[in-house]
Structures are given as structure tokens and as C-alpha cells.
């Protein structure tokens, strides 16, 4: 009887831990707020909020980062502009083009 009770309690703990685990993939996000600037021609830019988000890690702790970022720029007027993703392949192609220009 004690053995069955021990097995049932172990099963209950296992289910509780499994249900409390975070989702399989989480995301990291960083928001950078630039200070407000004047528009008097003093070489300043309008205030923009920039958010970078990147894929997270799986529940087993293995990181799943491929170097891709979603960049969302929010202008001071509340409009948003989605920037294209720069992948590792795109960066490599750009580096090759730059090397050709130098030579």
C-alpha cells in the first residue's frame, strides 16, 4: 500500500512539473528608446523606439539562434515599420560583394 502511494505521489509531482514547464520556445526581446530630440536642424533624429526580438531556447536548454532578428521601428507618431530580416546568408553575400568592390 505504501509503495502504491509513493508511486502515485511521484506521478503527481511529475505531471505538475511537466505542466508548469515553460512553452517549448521562448523569445528574447530588447527595446531601445532614444531620447526625444528637437527638430531645429541640429543634426538630431526624431525619437524612435527600436525593438529587437530573437528566437529563444527550447525547454532542454539548447539554444536555437540563427542570427536572424526581427526589427520593428516605431516612429514618434505611433506608426510602425517592419524591417527585413538580415540572415547569416545575407551577411555573407554582402561581405563577398564588399570584398569584390575593394579588389
Swiss-Prot record:
Entries under InterPro entries matching the protein: Cytomegalo_UL22A
Keyword Heme applies: no
Pfam families: Cytomega_UL20A
Start-end of Polar residues biased regions: 29-59
Glycosylation sites: 49
This protein's UniProt keywords: Glycoprotein, Signal, Virion
Biased composition range(s): Basic and acidic residues: 86-103
Effect of residue 33 to K: In strain: Isolate clinical 5A, Isolate clinical 44A and Isolate clinical 49A
UniProt name for this protein: Glycoprotein UL22A
GO-annotated cellular components: virion component
Signal peptide: 1-20
Reported impact of residue 76 to T: In strain: Isolate clinical 21A, Isolate clinical 22A, Isolate clinical 29A, Isolate clinical 38A and Isolate clinical 56A
Family designation: Belongs to the HHV-5 UL22A protein family.
Gene designation per UniProt: UL22A
Chain residue ranges for the region called Disordered: 21-103
Subcellular location as annotated: Virion
Keyword NADP applies: no
Amino acid at each position: 500500500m505504501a509503495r502504491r502511494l509513493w508511486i502515485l505521489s511521484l506521478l503527481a509531482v511529475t505531471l505538475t512539473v511537466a505542466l508548469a514547464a515553460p512553452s517549448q520556445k521562448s523569445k528574447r526581446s530588447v527595446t531601445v528608446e532614444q531620447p526625444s530630440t528637437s527638430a531645429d536642424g541640429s543634426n538630431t533624429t526624431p525619437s524612435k523606439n527600436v525593438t529587437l526580438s530573437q528566437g529563444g531556447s527550447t525547454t532542454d536548454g539548447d539554444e536555437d539562434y540563427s542570427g536572424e532578428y526581427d526589427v520593428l521601428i516605431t516612429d514618434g507618431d505611433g506608426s510602425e515599420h517592419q524591417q527585413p530580416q538580415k540572415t547569416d546568408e545575407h551577411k555573407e553575400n554582402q561581405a563577398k560583394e564588399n570584398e569584390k568592390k575593394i579588389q
